[in-house]
Curated annotation (Swiss-Prot):
SMART domains the record matches: ANK (SM00248)
Role this protein plays: Plays a central role during spermatogenesis by repressing transposable elements and preventing their mobilization, which is essential for the germline integrity. Acts via the piRNA metabolic process, which mediates the repression of transposable elements during meiosis by forming complexes composed of piRNAs and Piwi proteins and governs the methylation and subsequent repression of transposons. Its association with pi-bodies suggests a participation in the primary piRNAs metabolic process.
Subcellular location field: Cytoplasm
Composition bias type Gly residues, residue spans: 1-16
Description of how the protein assembles with itself and partners: Interacts with DDX4, PIWIL1, RANBP9 and TDRD1.
Name of the molecule in the record: Ankyrin repeat, SAM and basic leucine zipper domain-containing protein 1
Keyword rRNA-binding appears in the UniProt entry: no
Source species: Microcebus murinus (Gray mouse lemur)
UniProt superkingdom: Eukaryota
GO cellular component, one term: pi-body
PROSITE patterns on file: ANK_REP_REGION (PS50297), ANK_REPEAT (PS50088)
Key words, A-Z: ANK repeat, Cytoplasm, Developmental protein, Differentiation, Meiosis, Phosphoprotein, Repeat, RNA-mediated gene silencing, Spermatogenesis
Length: 481
């Protein structure tokens, strides 16, 4: 009854696996003689025909079979229902027909819900969104989790569907729910590198500080997976995006986030979310969206903006208020500078030797930190230009700065050699200075030598007197001492 192959078989969404490779579905094109079922089919054959009609998306045959008495919630082998299969391939019309015939939108198989299956389906985001909307309209719960505690919004975020994320939240989905590994929808979006989803979730009140079971926050997850643009954006402390839509009603949220596609389905909606570049993301995160057109008109890149001086800000028409926001954000991102003010004032002549030694040790430690920092940069820097995520200025600028850095390092090396020679000179002069007052250790050593020599001399003199006394007594026994 079937011939030929048809695409690949849909599997359970979000990494959930069924008990069989094909879950009881035979994939193929349905070779039909007639559009009508002229002869009643046996139950077993009718079920096979129903499965093949679902597989090929034959809406009219599905309706005929339903009219013939087959159950809309038929449980095929391994437990999948017709609606679950239709949702897994994002077949909007098939989902609509089955729901209109009374299919259970809240059905689950081993905690794999139909809504989860739809959110992780194969197909365009527009198709997936329409299927999700249909299921939500039939009271499918957006907060029911699978065996791994992942909810529909996590699957939508993981697969990069900001429109689906928005409509789920509009229907009551919890944004900050965590799965068995502590991942939230934001963590999944950051892990997979879905910038648009990250922005949308922040608007919807996602908490970017929630940690996974291994203690990582979304920005760290993004960095670990080489999504540096998302890492930089999530690292910003100032983020007026966060929670912008959190207090709106469901109707207000849908109205703000989604637009109607009147050309295709007037009763279905989908988002018109636009992707941002790195400059737009930076400005958007600071609430400076109004500056976007101004900076683009003047061909100012993000790198240029981050290195502007006060006069350049003013020259390019950036107000003091906006300047302060940019500078505050930069301050948050800067690595703390070396605080040499905490070191002793080495120029003073009364400085102690211990303080000077401590200064040199701290200076050496700071140099070690600088070497490590450069080594880390070399390790993290992409080896191929096509792997660079953020917009870069001309490589000549970086080369020029590196040349200045090399020059400064050479100057530092020269100054340290001068310092070393000066210290060596002072040491030599001190050793040859007759007025030099030795340290307590040296004085005590000299005193001990004198005491030792005196003791030996006294003992020797006493022994000599004893010998002389014995000799005299033998020769002159009448002499008394």
């Amino acid at each position: 009854m079937a011939s030929g192959g048809l695409r690949g078989l849909a599997v359970a969404g979000g990494g959930e696996s069924s008990d069989s490779e094909d879950d009881g579905w035979e994939i193929g094109y349905l070779d039909r003689v007639s559009q009508k079922l002229k002869v009643p089919l046996p139950v077993e054959e009718k079920n096979e025909t129903f499965k093949k009609a679902l597989t090929t998306g034959d809406i009219s045959l599905v309706q005929e079979l339903l009219d013939s008495g087959i159950s809309v919630d038929s449980s095929f082998r391994y437990g999948w229902t017709p609606l679950m299969y239709a949702a897994s391939i994002a077949n909007v019309e098939l989902v609509r027909v089955l729901l209109d015939r009374g299919a259970n939108a809240s059905f689950d198989k081993d905690k794999q819900t139909i809504l989860i299956t739809a959110c992780s389906a194969r197909g365009s985001e527009e198709q997936i969104l329409k299927c999700v909307e249909l299921l939500l309209s039939r009271n499918a719960d957006p907060n029911v989790a699978c065996r791994r505690l992942m909810t529909p919004i996590m699957y939508a975020a993981r697969d990069g569907h900001p429109q689906v994320v928005a409509v789920l939240v509009a229907h009551g989905a919890e944004v900050n729910t965590q799965d068995e590994n502590g991942y939230t929808a934001l963590t999944w979006a950051a892990r997979q590198g879905h910038k648009n989803v990250v922005l949308k979730l922040l608007e919807l009140g996602a908490n970017k500080m929630l940690q996974t079971k291994d203690g990582k926050i979304p920005s760290e997850i993004a960095k670990r997976n080489k999504h540096l643009e998302i890492f930089n954006f999530l690292s910003l402390t100032l983020n007026p995006l966060e929670g912008n839509l959190k207090q709106l009603t469901k109707e207000e949220t849908i109205c703000k986030l989604l637009t109607t596609d009147s050309d295709k389905e007037k009763d279905h909606i989908f988002s018109s979310y636009t992707a941002f570049g790195d400059l737009e993301i930076f400005l958007h995160g600071l609430g400076l969206e109004h500056m976007t057109d101004l900076l683009k008109e003047k061909d100012i890149t993000l790198r240029h903006l981050l290195t502007m001086r006060k006069d350049e800000f003013t020259k390019n028409g950036i107000t003091n208020k906006d300047q302060q926001k940019i500078l505050s954000a930069l301050k948050e991102l800067e690595v703390e500078e070396i605080k040499f003010g905490e070191l002793p004032e080495v120029a003073k002549l009364e400085i102690s030797g211990d303080e000077f030694l401590n200064f040199l040790l701290k200076l050496n430690k700071q140099c070690g930190h600088l070497i490590t920092a450069v080594q880390n940069i070399i390790t993290e820097l992409p080896v191929n230009s096509h792997k660079i995520v953020l917009e870069w200025a001309s490589p000549r600028n970086f080369t020029s700065v590196c040349e200045e850095l090399v020059s400064n390092v050479e100057d530092l090396s020269e100054e340290v050699h001068k310092l070393k020679d000066l210290i060596q000179k002072l040491q030599n002069e001190r050793e040859n200075d007759p007025t030099h007052i030795p340290l307590m250790e040296e004085v005590s050593t000299w005193n001990s030598r004198i005491l030792k020599r005196t003791a030996i001399a006294v003992c020797g003199f006493g022994f000599l007197l004893f010998i002389c006394k014995l000799t005299v007594q033998r020769k002159y026994p009448n002499i008394c001492f």
